Amino acid sequence: MKSFCDNDDNNHSNTTNLLGFSLSSNMMKMGGRGGREAIYSSSTSSAATSSSSVPPQLVVGDNTSNFGVCYGSNPNGGIYSHMSVMPLRSDGSLCLMEALNRSSHSNHHQDSSPKVEDFFGTHHNNTSHKEAMDLSLDSLFYNTTHEPNTTTNFQEFFSFPQTRNHEEETRNYGNDPSLTHGGSFNVGVYGEFQQSLSLSMSPGSQSSCITGSHHHQQNQNQNHQSQNHQQISEALVETSVGFETTTMAAAKKKRGQEDVVVVGQKQIVHRKSIDTFGQRTSQYRGVTRHRWTGRYEAHLWDNSFKKEGHSRKGRQVYLGGYDMEEKAARAYDLAALKYWGPSTHTNFSAENYQKEIEDMKNMTRQEYVAHLRRKSSGFSRGASIYRGVTRHHQHGRWQARIGRVAGNKDLYLGTFGTQEEAAEAYDVAAIKFRGTNAVTNFDITRYDVDRIMSSNTLLSGELARRNNNSIVVRNTEDQTALNAVVEGGSNKEVSTPERLLSFPAIFALPQVNQKMFGSNMGGNMSPWTSNPNAELKTVALTLPQMPVFAAWADS
């Protein structure tokens, strides 16, 4: 068998790396001189230290071999403590391989350990167990399974370069306190906890390599070690599980994934609940839930509309906001029946809308959409039933606004006392900026579209209405007097129409007679006024319309 102690310095370094023990400087000098003398030292680690190390089992070799080197309380074999001495032959070579080649039977007792005479070749059969002292290597046992290639497998383990690299890596892992318990064990790639063979040889130590350990003490140490090994194994399993859980949680947080449940290597991602706040879906067709207000809105897609400059055909028609989902669904049904007829798909049966179908026959699509909006329970931007109208949060008055007209910003139209006035202001602005296709709160036939489009300013609701040519007189008495003037001079012609009065009149003048100016009024009257009542009539009929301030400012 090849000796592990060669004269080459490289072999010395490899041997120390393989077996995991260190040689002092004096020892290396002795090896360099070619000497075969060795000074041994006992291990400074106590039994408590060795029992605190982690031991499960490290099986070395291929799958066909049952050979194993164990550190623990396995009755079949194992290493129970660090070797405090290296057995040498008479020529100075290691005899570890020769000791490992020996095999024992399955019923071999723990007290039949190798003796000193076995290593020095002076063993006698009549030597008593009490007289012979156990070597500190007495805890080295052999596997009960006898295989002819045991020596070869073990020798390949110490000579295989990948195994040496693995041993070096495990020693590096042993320095990490987070992976080891007290720094006394390492985690191997085989899934087992293994302990490297750490042997120390010090030149200053004496040759007291023989210890007087007895069988009773060995049994106690074995029981104590097995209990510690079981506790440490359970703690390591919990630590590894916690480490995996923390790693998975950190990975999920980094990727921003939802909570997952691991079931047999499969990840099941939970979907969001249907009742969660903020969703925009509904069980009814054409109904969405507003993510901010929580109110339900009804929309209809009009695919018959084609806007210039847009490749997509159609537009979304807003039908109003509702506090209940069923109301929004019914609004969609009515609009769909108006647009597409009774053959369209509705949320509820068309038989429930017989009365509404008769009413919508006299309205256009835009008129009926405006009718549905006015019946809604409120828009998303305020509590008004009219489009573009909101209520001021401080003084409670109604404000009118229109969006996406002045540089894609909201245009403030003013503050009004009633919702209707604010709604009219919105309608006028919508017609002014969007033409005849504008969606208005009231029927578009209510307004003079040509006049609104030709005006340079936004007209008020009164001026924007159709048939608004009469003078508004707020005083009832003045209105009665004006009617009397018109009726009194309706059958008389004006002799000199070129001399009509053209001064602006704010109010109508009452009928003039002689009683108003006295008895001498008729004689002193100017000759060019033959019929003052007729002239007053002409004045009243030819009064120019007073200019009305069309723009309104914020109050």
From Swiss-Prot:
Impact noted for substituting residue 413 to Q = Reduced activation of transcription
Explain what the record says happens when changing residue 427 to G: Reduced DNA-binding and loss of activation of transcription
Q: Does the keyword Transit peptide apply?
A: no
Biased composition (Low complexity) is annotated at 41-53, 199-208, 218-231
**Mutation effect (residue 389 to A):** Loss of activation of transcription
Name the source's superkingdom: Eukaryota
What exactly does this protein do? Transcription activator that recognizes and binds to the DNA consensus sequence 5'-CAC[AG]N[AT]TNCCNANG-3'. Required for the initiation and growth of ovules integumenta, and for the development of female gametophyte. Plays a critical role in the development of gynoecium marginal tissues (e.g. stigma, style and septa), and in the fusion of carpels and of medial ridges leading to ovule primordia. Also involved in organs initiation and development, including floral organs.
Q: Does the keyword Transport apply?
A: no
Protein name, per record: AP2-like ethylene-responsive transcription factor ANT
Which residue ranges does the Swiss-Prot or TrEMBL entry mark as DNA-binding? 283-349, 385-443
Q: List the GO terms this entry assigns under cellular component, sorted alphabetically.
A: nucleus
Tell me what happens on changing residue 288 to A.
Reduced activation of transcription
SMART domains reported in the protein's UniProt record: AP2
Question: What protein family does this chain belong to?
Answer: Belongs to the AP2/ERF transcription factor family. AP2 subfamily.
- Which Pfam family, giving just one, matches this sequence? AP2
Its quaternary structure? Interacts with ANL2, HDG2 and HDG10, and possibly with GL2, HDG3, HDG8, ATML1 and PDF2.
InterPro entries linked to this entry: AP2/ERF_dom, AP2/ERF_dom_sf, DNA-bd_dom_sf
Mutating residue 301 to R leads to what result? Reduced DNA-binding and loss of activation of transcription
Question: Region entry Disordered: which residue ranges?
Answer: 34-56, 199-231
Q: Main site of residence?
A: nucleus
